[in-house]
C-alpha cells in the first residue's frame, strides 16, 4: 500500500507576484513519480483564517498519512525544516485578506514540536546536494499558523519546511516585510527547491509508512 503525502505551498503575498514555496510544490508535483508514494499537493491562501481552514479541509478530503506544509522565508539561504510551531501570531504586514492579528493562536501550549524527524529531513536534503539546516523559528506569520494547524488538526506525522524566498531574475520583496534577516540572498532556483522537497517527501514518508 502506498503512503499518501499531502504537501502544501503558499500563494504570493506582500506585493510579490510569486511565492517560492508554491512554485516549488507545483514543480515537484509535475515531476514526481513513485509507485510507493502518492503525492497530493495544493497551493493555499496566505491568510491567518483561510490558510489553516484550507489545510484542515485538505486533510479531511484526502486522508493523508503524512502532512508537509511549506512556506518561504526571506533572509534564508538554506532549506530549513522547522522544529516547532509557537502559540503566537504577529502580523508585521496584513495577510491577503487584509487581516493583521496579534496574540495567541489557540488555548494550547506555547510550543508544539514537529512530528517529522527534522534531522532526517536535513540529511536527506543535503544528500540531494541542496543546503539545509534545522530551524527553531517558524516566525509569527501565516506559516507558523498553518504549521500549528497541521499539528493540532492532524494526528499523524506532520511538519513544516521553510524554503528561501528565491525569484527568477529579481529579488523578492517579501524578505524585508517578514524577516529581519532579509539582506541574505540565495543562489537556489525553483527547480533546486523542488529537488529539496522531493527529498523531504521521501524522507517524511518513512514516518507514515
Model-inferred region functions:
Residues 15, 167-173:
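Short active-site-adjacent structural elements
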Amino acid at each position: 500500500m502506498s503512503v499518501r503525502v499531502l504537501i502544501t505551498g503558499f500563494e504570493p503575498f506582500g506585493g510579490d507576484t510569486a511565492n517560492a514555496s508554491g512554485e516549488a510544490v507545483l514543480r515537484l508535483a509535475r515531476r514526481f513519480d513513485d509507485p510507493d508514494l502518492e503525492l497530493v499537493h495544493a497551493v493555499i491562501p496566505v491568510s491567518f483564517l483561510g490558510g489553516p481552514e484550507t489545510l484542515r479541509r485538505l486533510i479531511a478530503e484526502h486522508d493523508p498519512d503524512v502532512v508537509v506544509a511549506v512556506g518561504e522565508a526571506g533572509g534564508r539561504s538554506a532549506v530549513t525544516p522547522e522544529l516547532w510551531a509557537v502559540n503566537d501570531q504577529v502580523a508585521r504586514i496584513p495577510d491577503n485578506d487584509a487581516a493583521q492579528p496579534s496574540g495567541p493562536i489557540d488555548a494550547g501550549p506555547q510550543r508544539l514540536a514537529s512530528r517529522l524527524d527534522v534531522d532526517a529531513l536535513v540529511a536527506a536534503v543535503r544528500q540531494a546536494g541542496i543546503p539545509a539546516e534545522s530551524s527553531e523559528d517558524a516566525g509569527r506569520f501565516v506559516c507558523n499558523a498553518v504549521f500549528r494547524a497541521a499539528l493540532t488538526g492532524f494526528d499523524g506525522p506532520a511538519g513544516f519546511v521553510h524554503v528561501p524566498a528565491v525569484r527568477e531574475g529579481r529579488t523578492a520583496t517579501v524578505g524585508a516585510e517578514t524577516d529581519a534577516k532579509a539582506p541574505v540572498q540565495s543562489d537556489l532556483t525553483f527547480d533546486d527547491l523542488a529537488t529539496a522537497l522531493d527529498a523531504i517527501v521521501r524522507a517524511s514518508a518513512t514516518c507514515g509508512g
